[in-house]
């Protein structure tokens, strides 16, 4: 078959051959019968293949694809299908046709169309074969592709593969119209008797139809004559049925009416009961409204009291936090070193072995400051602090890998336990970071203990941590000095040693109230510096203005034990202390009583009967003031154990004649510096902390 060939005209029948006859033992699917009435359409086409393509381009192999076109007697229309490209093949077999990508209005019932096969290389294709195909004129090739001719196109239909027909010599034209079939498939047609039976059956059916029509007409005529009487009977029966239905409905409605009337009476009785109950409840409601108005007034008063108390609590909390900045001042020197109460505390990674004593003291101050801040802010610390001064510890209750005995870590260097000490300092820094986070402050470096704490107090709590600013004073209520002067018992009775003292707890509600009341403090001593005026022969009783509060308290306790003098008047500033060497009641010049770290001057008369500079001048007419931080220090009396519950009964408030306005805290800070110095000396040499005996020359 050559290119650009066209086949048409009458389609001859194929000669007899193996494709037309069914051989014995062949499968049933191999049966193929050529019928003149068989029609092949475009919708029956499944795939197309080409064999033995002649290449005129000089290439050994070609890239090929085909296109399908509709046509008529005059022209060929635009392609309606294009196949994929088969590369490097002269015997391509393209995929099955996809009718889904063909135009929707494509007429698939046509049996004539044009096939064009294109070939080339690198997108340069040219027409190789063009064939106008009549599907009815194709020859059946079999269930498999067989091709011997050049440029042969094979069409795959539903029952097998078809190709171009070829002329067969040696067969007369008369045999071309013969149909070769199997004898087993041939049978006889109808005979005369069968046709007669069919004719008689048709006649009977016709006669039956005529009879049916006749009977139908008779029935219609009878119905037409009796239609009037039937209508009357129908209406009569309908009326009887309606009467029966209405009677039944009447009985049902009567019964329903009786039930509704009974229910109405029941509802009326219930309504009367509810009306009486409503009247009773209405009266109660009026009483409750009156009570509600009173409760609203009480609630308003309580709300105002709550707001006032809450505001006072907030102010008091800020005052206490401000007091902490006076008790534990954090300073920065020119070398960028931070000190708490005058004790240097480097960052956690800069600790040195030679500074173990000062580090323990500074960490004790810092731990107490952090624990008190958390107590005032009501923020529980994640790692609880056990305050023991310079032997404070901290617990880790979070880490589940630790046993109960291993949860407590020291905040002081302890021999070879350097790792536990470092971890304890780390937990302390974590507590500081927790407080900072509670107030919206970040902690980029945990190692800076005092810088983080100072920054937190100044920016988070709005409290200044240095010791150079002046505190505000608060008014102190007036009180008669005789009330305090008449207290039984002095401080000399039962004063325990500072290192063995334990805090006594209140056993009754009255004692608890007494413990909450701040006792008098060293306010008069802060007003004017205490001047020690020694007498002849009493060189051992010389007291410096900034002496240690601990030593002064011990001396004062020993002297009171010897003399049995009531110290209540000495604290209030109304009476002078009696000297053990002067039995006649002469005033001891220059004697200073120390209470909780502060010297309290007594009334001292000079030789000429005049008051000394250290004496106090009561002013009962004016309401005097003392600093908030000084008033708070009075609570330390009960905390340090220098007084008992009975002695605190007389210290319920600060007497007016001993409370004065204070503008600076130099003496208080001096006391703290002296105490810090002695604590540091204790860490270096325990013997230096002891007070020299009276018999010594010091």
UniProtKB/Swiss-Prot annotation:
The segment annotated Required for interaction with PRKDC, XRCC6 and XRCC5 runs over: 442-698
Region Sufficient for interaction with VPS16, required for interaction with CEP63, as annotated, extends over 269-441
Q: What is the lineage of its organism?
A: Eukaryota, Metazoa, Chordata, Craniata, Vertebrata
What's the encoding gene here?
Uvrag
Return the protein name: UV radiation resistance-associated protein
Q: Which stretches are tagged as biased composition: Low complexity?
A: 1-10
Please tell me whether the keyword Repeat is annotated for this protein.
no
- Domain (C2): residue spans on this chain: 23-149
The job of this chain, per UniProt, is described as: Versatile protein that is involved in regulation of different cellular pathways implicated in membrane trafficking. Involved in regulation of the COPI-dependent retrograde transport from Golgi and the endoplasmic reticulum by associating with the NRZ complex; the function is dependent on its binding to phosphatidylinositol 3-phosphate (PtdIns(3)P). During autophagy acts as a regulatory subunit of the alternative PI3K complex II (PI3KC3-C2) that mediates formation of phosphatidylinositol 3-phosphate and is believed to be involved in maturation of autophagosomes and endocytosis. Involved in maintaining chromosomal stability. Promotes DNA double-strand break (DSB) repair by association with DNA-dependent protein kinase complex DNA-PK and activating it in non-homologous end joining (NHEJ). Required for centrosome stability and proper chromosome segregation.
Q: List the Pfam families hit by this protein, alphabetically.
A: ATG14, C2
**Could you describe the subunit structure of this protein?**
Component of the PI3K (PI3KC3/PI3K-III/class III phosphatidylinositol 3-kinase) complex II (PI3KC3-C2) in which the core composed of the catalytic subunit PIK3C3, the regulatory subunit PIK3R4 and BECN1 is associated with UVRAG; in the complex interacts directly with BECN1. PI3KC3-C2 can associate with further regulatory subunits such as RUBCN and probably SH3GLB1/Bif-1. Interacts with SH3GLB1; UVRAG bridges the interaction to BECN1 indicative for an association with the PI3K complex PI3KC3-C2. Interacts with RINT1.
Source organism of the structure: Mus musculus (Mouse)
The highest taxon in the source lineage is Eukaryota
Phosphothreonine is carried by which residues?
517
Q: Where mainly found?
A: other
